[in-house]
């Protein structure tokens, strides 16, 4: 058996569910209102069924026994005839605040409205539960509140700023109930009104916005006088205090444990007019003072205030004549406590209470401008406070500072004039005939350059360098880099002498130069201000510009010689319009006209620079490293020798001479370059002529086969002994169908039998051998697809001369032969086919084995019944 449920708890829940129902509520307790005010009674309903919007009926009873219909939200004919006229006028109305709430408004409550008011709601519930009406009692009191000014009509007060004033308001009540009064002072200026100070019904003071500081300082106070007078006291009137003052009094009573305002009255007490304080300032219109003297400016004050006001005087300085303080500088200030705030050279004092003097000592030109006097009058307030009652700005006083500028002349001369390019130039700028050049004046210089034009076109000057008053030297764009490199030097020898030196004058430096000497005056803050500029007359830097001339003549002492002899050539140099020249020589060689081996090719052999340092250029004959000599015979003559000349040395030989001019120190400048006449080396011989050709029995091979290429040399003309001939053979290949790519070196064999093989990126290899005296065999082993292309050989013959020396002949080239490498289809597909057939056979056998195993072990069914038992089963079914 289970435990029985707790019966008391169930009964309590059931009772709560049964008791719950509609609840209509109006304010509890008694509502108290004053005759002539508005009565508002709220009513709401909760815990109801039916539509969300509920209707309300109001009834009134003066005694609480019988009620008269007053108003309804849903039935037009509900009100009694007694109240219909007031409903039509709007004195009585219902205002819905929510679907379940409504307010009854009765304007201008009368004593006859005192009684009981009942709020009821028609039923929309399924069952009648709860309360459908609620009643509240209203008491209407007579108007017992009396509010008024202390005098009628309201007075008009005319005050000056800073003067005190008082205003009084009479407020009292004879209400039979316990009520409190609250009072608030307001200031009205047109449509704007401000709360000044309020006394709440609980006896607390509340200053209005903007009056907090004045209230806490005691400047604005509120107190009572007697039993019914409230006094507003202002210790110091401000311009913002002008306007109409009203006294607002409200009466409060406690309802339902809280205070409720039951009526409010306001009365105009007084109109206050604040007269502005008259303040005028007078300063001198214009003042002229000599530089170095003292400036004295007066500011005279005129005002109608005779009470205890204190002036605050401030002097400002600015460069423009307007009266705004923008871009102005404060010079001195005398505060209301007579304390002066100024810089050391400025003083501010007052002769009497209405005249203030500004003294600026030792004025300079920077003190020229406009001076303004700003005066503010301060009146004492409550609790030792001060407030500003007037402020005025004077008209600007124009001050001009005259200066006796120094007098001097500037003279510019050229102490060094260049005769050639790269010569130095030196200019001297001197200051002469100085007058009134005091100790506080400093002289600086600026250098300018102007290009010389043959016509009358105006050319702008270019700044070279400028010196500031603090001796800082700044370079112009034209001279900045050269000055940093030390080519331009600016110096100051004496206080009146400035120098400008160009270490190496170029043709671009030709033109007019002039200097500008500036006078600078020291200011009080130790800064310097430019006061005067004096220009010198220009000095023209120019020299006759003639083109440099360099002539080189080459000659051959021995005009005819044979191969193996020594070749000698001398070069004579002459120059003009080149300063202190030194020469560098370069020997060049060109193939003679008609030589097709390397046409128009100039070869640099050996050189000698201006410091007589010899250098081999493109001399590549390793067997004759010491076979060429270049030496300096005289300052303008050079000799070139070539020992053991060969036939391949035939050509045109020249001397390329460059003249160098010193530019200072160990630096040189290239002045001119010239090429001598050619000296030809021509061997008058009837030697053999060599030709080269390429032959192959296998121009088309299958990949992997051997490629054989023969380079055959033929000799025409004179018959030579095989021991007197040797060859350098090189094989090249162009791996393309055309000759549009660069040739690749395959292998080379020099005349001494040394073989060199080029680097290859695939598996095939090459070999080169000499088959006979005039045949050379190139073999490509294990040919690949990349080995196709054009093949040719290059042959350099060497012939032994009668003197026993070997002479190098011109290099010859064979015509190319095209080699094709084909693919072997059978070999290419043999191994893939064998692999495919093998894999197919293995996969087929594996499939058969898997099928057999599956059918034997996995798919066989086990039969337990015998044939005889099956027959018996069939017999039973048939029976």
UniProtKB/Swiss-Prot annotation:
What are the annotated glycosylation sites? Answer: 44, 300, 383, 413, 525, 600, 618, 691
What keywords were assigned to this record?
Disulfide bond, Endoplasmic reticulum, Glycoprotein, Golgi apparatus, Immunoglobulin domain, Membrane, Phosphoprotein, Repeat, Signal, Transmembrane, Transmembrane helix
SUPFAM superfamilies assigned: Immunoglobulin
Where primarily located?
Answer: endoplasmic reticulum
Instruction: Give the CC-aspect GO terms.
Output: endoplasmic reticulum membrane; Golgi apparatus
Q: Which residues lie on this side of the membrane: Cytoplasmic?
A: 854-879
Pfam families (alphabetical) = V-set
Signal peptide positions are 1-21
Where the record places motif Cell attachment site is: 89-91, 703-705
The membrane topology noted for this protein in its Swiss-Prot or TrEMBL record is: Single-pass type I membrane protein
Residue ranges occupied by any Ig-like C2-type domain in the UniProt entry: 22-137, 149-263, 276-389, 406-536, 544-662, 688-813
- Describe, from its UniProt entry, the tissues in which this protein is expressed: Expressed in myoblasts (at protein level).
Q: Mark the residues carrying the PTM Phosphothreonine.
A: 271
Signal in keyword set: yes
Topological domain spans for side Extracellular: 22-832
Q: Which chain regions cross the lipid bilayer?
A: 833-853
What is known about what this protein does? Inhibits the binding of prostaglandin F2-alpha (PGF2-alpha) to its specific FP receptor, by decreasing the receptor number rather than the affinity constant. Functional coupling with the prostaglandin F2-alpha receptor seems to occur. In myoblasts, associates with tetraspanins CD9 and CD81 to prevent myotube fusion during muscle regeneration.
Task: Supply the PANTHER family for this chain.
Answer: PROSTAGLANDIN F2 RECEPTOR NEGATIVE REGULATOR, V-SET AND TRANSMEMBRANE DOMAIN-CONTAINING PROTEIN
Q: What is this protein called?
A: Prostaglandin F2 receptor negative regulator
């Amino acid at each position: 058996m289970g435990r029985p449920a707790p019966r008391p708890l169930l009964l309590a829940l059931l009772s709560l569910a049964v008791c719950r129902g509609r609840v209509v509520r109006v304010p509890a307790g008694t509502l108290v209102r004053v005759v002539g005010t508005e009565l508002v009674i709220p009513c709401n309903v909760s815990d109801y069924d039916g539509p969300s919007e509920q209707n309300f009926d109001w009834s009134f009873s003066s005694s609480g026994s019988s009620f008269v219909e007053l108003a309804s939200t849903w039935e037009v004919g509900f009100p009694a005839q007694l109240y219909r006229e007031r409903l039509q006028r709007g004195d009585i109305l219902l205002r819905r605040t929510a679907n379940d709430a409504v307010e009854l408004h009765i304007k201008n409550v009368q004593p006859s409205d005192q009684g009981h008011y009942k709020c009821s709601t028609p039923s929309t519930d399924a069952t009648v539960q709860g309360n459908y009406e609620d009643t509240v009692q209203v008491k209407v009191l007579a108007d017992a509140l009396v509010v008024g000014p202390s005098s009628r009509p309201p007075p008009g007060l005319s005050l000056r700023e800073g003067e005190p004033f008082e205003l009084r308001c009479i407020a009292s009540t004879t209400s039979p109930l316990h009520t409190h009064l609250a009072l608030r002072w307001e200031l009205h200026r047109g449509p704007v009104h401000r709360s000044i100070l309020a006394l709440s019904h609980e006896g607390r003071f509340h200053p209005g916005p903007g009056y907090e500081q004045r209230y806490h300082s005691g400047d604005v106070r509120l107190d009572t006088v007697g039993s019914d007078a409230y006094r507003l006291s202002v210790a110091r009137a401000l311009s913002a205090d002008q306007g109409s003052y009203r006294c607002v009094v409200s009466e409060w009573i406690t309802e339902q444990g809280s205070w409720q305002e039951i009526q409010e009255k306001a009365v105009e007490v007084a109109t206050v007019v604040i007269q502005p304080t008259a303040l005028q300032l007078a300063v001198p219109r214009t003042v002229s003072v000599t530089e170095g003297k003292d400036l004295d400016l007066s500011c005279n004050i005129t005002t109608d205030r005779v009470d205890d006001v204190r002036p605050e005087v401030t002097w400002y300085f600015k460069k423009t004549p307007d009266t705004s303080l923008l871009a102005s500088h404060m010079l001195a200030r005398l505060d209301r406590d007579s304390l002066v705030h100024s810089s050391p050279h400025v003083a501010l004092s007052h002769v009497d209470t209405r005249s203030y003097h500004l003294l600026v000592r030792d004025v300079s030109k920077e003190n020229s401008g406009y001076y303004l006097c700003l005066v503010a009058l301060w009146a004492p307030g409550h609790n030792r406070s001060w407030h500003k009652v007037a402020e005025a700005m004077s008209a600007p006083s124009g001050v001009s500072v005259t200066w006796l500028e120094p007098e001097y002349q500037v003279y510019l001369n050229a102490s060094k004039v260049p005769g050639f390019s790269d010569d130095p130039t030196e200019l001297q700028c001197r200051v002469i005939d100085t007058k009134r050049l005091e100790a506080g004046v400093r002289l600086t210089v600026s250098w300018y350059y102007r290009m010389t034009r043959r016509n009358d076109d105006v050319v702008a000057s270019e700044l070279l360098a400028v010196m500031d008053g603090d001796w800082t030297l700044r370079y112009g764009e034209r001279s900045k880099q050269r000055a940093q490199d030390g080519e331009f030097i600016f110096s100051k020898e004496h206080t009146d002498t400035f120098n400008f030196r160009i270490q190496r004058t170029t043709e671009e430096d030709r033109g007019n130069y002039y200097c500008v000497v500036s006078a600078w005056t020291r200011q009080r803050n130790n800064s310097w201000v430019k006061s005067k500029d004096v220009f010198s007359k220009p000095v023209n830097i120019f020299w006759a510009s003639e083109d440099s001339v360099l002539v080189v003549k080459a000659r051959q002492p021995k005009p005819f010689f044979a191969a193996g002899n020594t070749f000698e050539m001398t070069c004579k140099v002459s120059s003009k319009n080149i300063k202190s020249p030194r020469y560098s020589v370069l020997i060049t060689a060109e193939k003679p006209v008609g030589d097709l081996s390397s046409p128009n090719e100039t070869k640099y052999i050996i050189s000698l620079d201006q410091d007589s340092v010899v250098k081999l250029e493109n001399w590549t004959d390793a067997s004759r490293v010491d076979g060429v000599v270049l030496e300096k015979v005289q300052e303008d003559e050079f000799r070139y020798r070539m020992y053991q000349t060969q036939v391949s040395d035939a050509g045109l030989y020249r001397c390329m001479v460059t003249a160098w001019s010193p530019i200072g120190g160990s630096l040189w400048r290239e002045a001119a370059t010239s090429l001598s006449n050619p000296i030809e080396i021509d061997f008058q011989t009837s030697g053999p002529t060599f030709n080269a050709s390429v032959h192959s029995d296998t121009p088309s091979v299958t990949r992997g086969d051997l490629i054989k290429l023969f380079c055959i040399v033929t000799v025409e003309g004179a018959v030579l002994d095989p021991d007197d001939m040797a060859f350098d053979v090189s094989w090249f290949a162009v791996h393309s169908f055309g000759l549009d790519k660069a040739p690749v070196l395959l292998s080379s064999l020099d005349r001494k039998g040394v073989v060199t093989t080029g680097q290859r990126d695939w598996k095939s290899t090459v070999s080169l051998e000499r088959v006979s005296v005039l045949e050379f065999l190139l073999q490509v082993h294990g040919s690949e697809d990349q080995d196709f292309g054009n093949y040719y050989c290059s042959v350099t013959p060497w012939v032994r001369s009668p003197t026993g020396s070997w002479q190098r002949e011109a290099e010859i080239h064979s015509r190319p032969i095209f080699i094709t490498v084909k693919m072997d289809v059978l070999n290419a597909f043999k191994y893939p086919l064998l692999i495919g057939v093998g894999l197919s056979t293995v996969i087929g056998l594996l499939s058969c084995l898997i099928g057999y195993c599956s059918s034997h072990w996995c798919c066989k069914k086990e039969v337990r019944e015998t044939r005889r038992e099956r027959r018996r089963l069939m017999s039973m079914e048939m029976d």
